[in-house]
Amino acid sequence: MYGQQNNYGAPPPQQWGQAPPQGYQPGYQNGPPAVNYGAHPSQQQQWGAPPGPPQHQPYGAPPVNQYGAPPQHQQGYGGHSPQPPFGAPSPAPAGYGAPPTAPQGQYGAPSPYPQQPPQQGFGGPQQGYGSQPQGQSPMMYLGVPIPAPPPAVPVSTLAGYDARFDAERIRKATKGFGTDERTIIDTLSPLDAFQMDVLSRTYEQTVGRSLKSTLEKELSSWLEYTLVLLSLGPLGGDVYLLHRACNGMGTHEDLLNEVLLGRTNQEIFLLKEAYRRTYNQDLVQIVQGELSMKTERMFNMALSGQRDESPYLNHQLVQQDVETLYRAGPGKIGTDEIAICGILISRSKEHLKAIAQAFPARHRVSLSQMIHSEFSGHMRDALFFIARGVEADGDGVVRDCELLHAAMAGMGTKDERMIYRLVRNHWNRPRFNAIKNQYQVLYRNSLRRAVEGETTGKYEKALVGIIEQN
C-alpha cells in the first residue's frame, strides 16, 4: 500500500551528474502514502475518478531510497562503446537464445509433464505484427519477436523501413542550439523492436555516437528517461531497468518483481546473457547482493530458468498444489514460505491459472488475498504480483491496468513506475490494446486521458505518443 508521499518522482532542477541541491531528497519523504493499490478510485481522492475494479489486497510500497528520481547518466545497454562480450556462449545448434536444458523440479516437486516447447511470456506472442526479417526463427521477448543478440549477425536493413531517414531526422533535431524534442518523439514512438534496433545501429554508424548517449545529452528529466528506455528496445530496456533496480542506494524491489517474475526460461536466459554483455557482471550475483534470506532464495528460483513450460494441465496436481498452498499458509501456524514460492515460481502459467480458479472455490479466499494475509514485505509484493497476474483474465491484463492506475492514483504521480509500465507494455501492441480497453472498463476513463491528467509538455506528448502509436 502506498503511504503519504511528497514530490514522488519529482526530478531535481539541477543537471544530472551533479550533486543534489541541499535539502533535496528524491523519492518518498516521511514514509509512503496510505493509498490502497487497486482500490475503488473514490477512496484514493482522485478528481472525478470513476468506480474502480473489484477490491483486492494492495501492492506494497517501495523502500525509502532514491527510487523515483530520474537516473544518473550511466554507461549501459545501447550506450557508446559498450563492454565487450564476457563469457558469451558459442552459438548452439538450436539457435542462440535457447535456455540450457536443466532438470525440472529443482525447487519443489518434479514436473509431472513431458518436456514441451517453451511457453510464450508476457501474454503470449502477438500475431502478424513486427518487421522481423523473413526466413528467421524469431526470438521472443515480452511476447514479441526481437533481434537475436550477439553472437548472431545483426540485422542491417528491414523491408519497408528507412533507418537512414530516421537517423538523419534525429541528427537534425539535435544539431545546433536547442533540440527539436517533438521530432525525436515522433520518430521513436511508432517503432517496433526490430526497427528500433536497426535505427540505433544505423545512427551510431552514421553519426559516430550511440543514440542513447545523444538522447542523454540533448534531453533531461523524465522525457530523457522515457525516450532512452524506449530507444533500448524490449530486452535492452529491461537490462537497463535491472541495473537501475540494483544500482545506488537501496533496491528498487518493484522493478525486480516486474522484470524477473513470471518470465519464460528463454527470457531469463536472454536477460542474464544481455546483462553480462552490457555490464560485465553476473545478474544472479548482482540480485543476490541486493536481497537476503528467503527472498533471495525466491529470486534464485526465478533466475534459475527452470520453470515448467508444458501446455498440458494435470488437474490432479492442480488440486494437490491447492491443498499444499493452503497447508503451507492458512492451514498451519506460521507460513512455509519456500513451499509456496516453489509452486508459484516453478509451475507453468496455465497451471497457475488453474490454481487461481480452484483455490477460492475450495477455500473461499482468493490466492492473492491468501498471500497478502500470510506474507509481508518484499516477498508479499513479489508473490502478490504473480498471483494477480493469473487471476481475473489470467493473462495479467487486469493486473497491469491496476499497476498503471496505482502509478497515477493519490497524491502525486509515481513517474518512473508510470513510464516503465507504459513502455514495457507497449511493445506487444495487441496486448497493450487489451490493457487500454480494460483500463476504460475498470476506471471509466481512457488510459490516454489519465496520463494527460498527470503530465505536461513534451513529457506528456512522449507518453501519449507511446499510448497511441498504433
Curated annotation (Swiss-Prot):
GO molecular function (one): calcium ion binding
Start-end of each Annexin repeat: 161-232, 233-304, 316-388, 395-468
InterPro entries recorded: Annexin, Annexin_repeat, Annexin_repeat_CS, Annexin_sf
A single GO cellular-component term on record: vesicle membrane
The keyword DNA damage appears for this protein: no
Observed phenotype of the null mutant: Increases titan cell formation (low penetrance). Low or no sensitivity to high temperature or tacrolimus (calcineurin inhibitor); sensitivity may be background dependent. No cell population growth phenotype in a variety of conditions including high pH, low calcium, in presence of the antifungals amphotericin B or fluconazole, heavy metals (nickel or zinc), osmotic stress (NaCl), cell wall integrity stressors (Calcofluor White, caffeine, or Congo Red), oxidative stress (H2O2), or nitro-oxidative stress (NaNO2 or H2O2), or following ultraviolet light radiation. Normal mating.
Biased composition (Low complexity): 15-34, 93-110, 128-138
Keyword Repeat in annotation: yes
Top-level lineage group: Eukaryota
Keywords tagged on the record: Annexin, Calcium, Calcium/phospholipid-binding, Repeat
SMART domains, per the entry: ANX
Pfam families for this protein: Annexin (PF00191)
Coiled-coil stretches noted in the UniProt entry, renumbered to this chain: none
Pro residues biased stretches: 82-92
Role summary: Does not appear to play a major role in virulence. May play a role in titan cell formation.
Domain notes: A pair of annexin repeats may form one binding site for calcium and phospholipid.
Family per similarity comment: Belongs to the annexin family.
Name recorded for this polypeptide: Annexin C1
Provenance organism: Cryptococcus neoformans var. grubii serotype A (strain H99 / ATCC 208821 / CBS 10515 / FGSC 9487) (Filobasidiella neoformans var. grubii)
Gene: ANXC1
